[in-house]
């Protein structure tokens, strides 16, 4: 919506106006036009289909099976816009034994393996909450752009089945490859990064409570020593 696209978002309830509006609503709906539609009613569905006929991309994140029941599945949309692109976001994808299980960020954060690897060795798995939702939304946007490029080349639209669980798994690719290669299950390790040091957030002795330091080679280590007035450590 910030890149010259016209975005219309169907709302469940009428948004609050003025100072009572949620800051989160303003954040996630920046530059988007809202429309209140009851698509369970024929007249609401008809309005939606008229919008689809004028659109390039439709993105939805209903629970699997809902769009089919409402008559707004991909097969329905191509009847009014043959080259439409539809991106469906769900917790576990539209096929498979767990496809009907709904989920929010805390659920697919765990299912994707990220929660298990986030935190300290002596602590519980940690949620990163909204960051997971944003990653899934970003993946949906990139999928839509790739589909638009494909349509530009071929003239064909397409349906994209996006699993939030799989998107989360892309964040732990190194851990997945390690397990596949060695059979070892990676463990939580706080902010520690095994290939670089110092590379962490450290407590301070002065007024600043914390400092973030990232050193990746000998040249950066020497520069850090000079900055700390500890040249003898170089």
Give the location of each predicted region.
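Beta-strand segments within the central parallel beta-sheet cores of soluble alpha/beta enzyme folds
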Residues: 157-165
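Mid-domain beta-loop-alpha active-site segment that forms a flexible
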Residues: 130-145, 164-172, 216, 220
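Aromatic-enriched alpha-helical interface/lid elements that frame and gate functional surfaces
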Residues: 198-234
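Oxidoreductase and adenylate-handling cofactor-binding alpha/beta cores
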Residues: 137-157, 170, 174-182, 225-232
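Short Gly/Pro-enriched turn/cap motifs at secondary-structure boundaries
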Residues: 186-194, 201, 213
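Residues that act as N-cap/strand-start positions at coil-to-secondary-structure junctions
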Residues: 21-22, 196-198
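Short Pro/Gly-enriched beta-strand edge/turn motifs at strand-loop
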Residues: 9-12, 180-187
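N-terminal helix-loop segment corresponding to the beta1-alpha1 unit
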Residues: 2-143, 147-156
């Amino acid at each position: 919506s910030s890149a010259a696209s016209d975005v219309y978002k169907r709302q469940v309830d009428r948004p609050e106006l003025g100072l009572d509006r949620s800051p989160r609503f303003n954040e996630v709906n920046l530059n988007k036009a809202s429309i209140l539609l009851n698509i369970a009613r024929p007249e609401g569905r008809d309005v939606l289909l008229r919008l689809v006929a004028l659109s390039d991309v439709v993105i939805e994140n209903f629970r699997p099976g809902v769009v089919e029941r409402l008559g707004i599945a991909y097969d329905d949309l191509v009847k009014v816009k043959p080259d439409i692109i539809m991106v469906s976001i769900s917790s576990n994808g539209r096929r498979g034994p767990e496809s009907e299980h709904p989920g929010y960020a805390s659920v697919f954060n765990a299912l994707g393996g990220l929660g298990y690897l986030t935190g300290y060795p002596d602590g519980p798995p940690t949620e990163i909450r909204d960051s997971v939702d944003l990653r899934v939304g970003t993946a949906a946007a990139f999928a839509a752009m790739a589909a638009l490029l494909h349509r530009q080349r071929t003239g064909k639209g397409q349906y994209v089945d996006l699993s939030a669980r799989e998107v989360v798994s892309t964040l732990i690719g190194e851990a997945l490859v390690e397990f596949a290669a060695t059979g070892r299950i990676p463990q939580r390790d706080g902010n520690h990064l095994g290939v670089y040091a110092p590379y962490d957030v450290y407590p301070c002795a002065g007024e600043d409570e914390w400092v973030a330091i990232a050193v990746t080679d000998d040249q950066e280590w020497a520069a850090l020593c000079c900055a700390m007035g500890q040249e003898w450590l170089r």
